[in-house]
Amino acid sequence: MHPTRVWSLAATLFLVVGSMGPRLATGATRPRPRPNPPEETQAAAASPGPSPIEVRFDFEVVERYLSFEEHGGASREELQQWVRLPGNRELLRQGRTEGGLTPEILMEAVRVSLSGQEFHGPAVLGSFTAGKGALLRQLVDTIRSRQGEFAGAAAEALRPYLPVGRQFPPFTVYFHLGGSWDGRTSDAVYINLTLFQARAPQGIAGLDALLVHELFHQAHGYLFPGIDDYSSPQSGLYSLLLRLQQEGIARYLECRYIQRGGAVSDVDRINLDRYLEGLQTAPEHVTDLEAIREALRRNRTLEARHLAGQGFQSGGPLYAIGHRIAESIATVSGQAELARTLSEGPVAFARAYEQSIRSGEAPLFTAAMREDVQALRRGYGREPVRASRLRREGLALIGSQEL
């Protein structure tokens, strides 16, 4: 859910992780064409060229685990090397954030699993299911054989929303084992194959759409810095709007991708129904948005952060609000206007939405929210990265003087 450029501002700026938790899903998948809608076909025809992004798949975490299984176990040294693989970074990062998962516990999970038992660890880890090495091998081989197809489909879905000629570094997709999510994005994209393994025999159904969602986050992270700063009312509102933009557009793109493909799997149908229902029910959750805004206005920033976390947890109602905002902008003002907001930020996203509200439509922003967005545009929103850095440095100075 956020940028991949690292801003070392100690818990003020960070790489946003874009995940909705495990998508509800079962069902088989098969290769299918993804025809673009007319306006996107015209845009692609007008500006042909190489893929806008290069995607690399990394299976080392899973391959080494399968090697351990084939050899009947692993030494402590081998497990220590395995746990330090780049593909395990996000799992361990979330383990530190949520608590309960350390490298030692992850190594123990592998050891127990290799002995033929199921390891029940902290919630952030999920579970390691033993005795399914053949299925895991099948998943890896299938994904590997289709990685060009998956990467190409995601790149074409993102093409209309990326600046023409913009150069991106290669994007890496790491496949790992364990976690309470299907996909997350921070410095790279991390896909949890344990959940796909648990869907057997449906396999990799839904992976292509998930990659569209997560690779969008990766690309957006290079276009605009990620900020999660609830240290002041304005920085908190900015952070809230940015998360709405990130998750809203990611879901919008994923939803359109599924619709264009005809929702051929049960996974696609379940997710599509969920997303479309969210579009319809989003106005019912304006009160959730207002509760966060009101907490910020009263300078109850910790409460606001907590409420926002609840609203986004596991694809919660704030995803649907962001999706509806993105849908409204694209429908009324066009996809070019929605794409413009990616480089200009969340205040531009909010303003574009206000200009796209149709007559008779119940707006998702109250008058008070619109007023606060205007104030944000005049204040913190002008230089958000600098403002957060200066505030952090100022608070650190005050703290040192108090000591």
Where do the protein language model's features map onto the residues?
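Bacterial N-terminal signal peptides that target proteins for export
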Residues: 1-10
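Bacterial N-terminal signal peptides
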Residues: 10-21
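Boundary at the C-terminal end of the N-terminal hydrophobic targeting segment
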Residues: 22-27
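N-terminal mature-domain "stem" immediately C-terminal to a signal peptide or N-terminal signal-anchor/transmembrane
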Residues: 30-120, 362-379, 385-399
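Post-HExxH zinc-binding segment in Zn-dependent metallohydrolases
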Residues: 48-78, 223-292, 359-364, 368
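Structured segments of extracytoplasmic/periplasmic soluble domains
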Residues: 64-72, 82-89, 160-161, 218, ...
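Acidic/His-rich structured neighborhood in mature extracellular/periplasmic domains
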Residues: 115-272
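Pan-zinc metallopeptidase signature
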Residues: 271-403
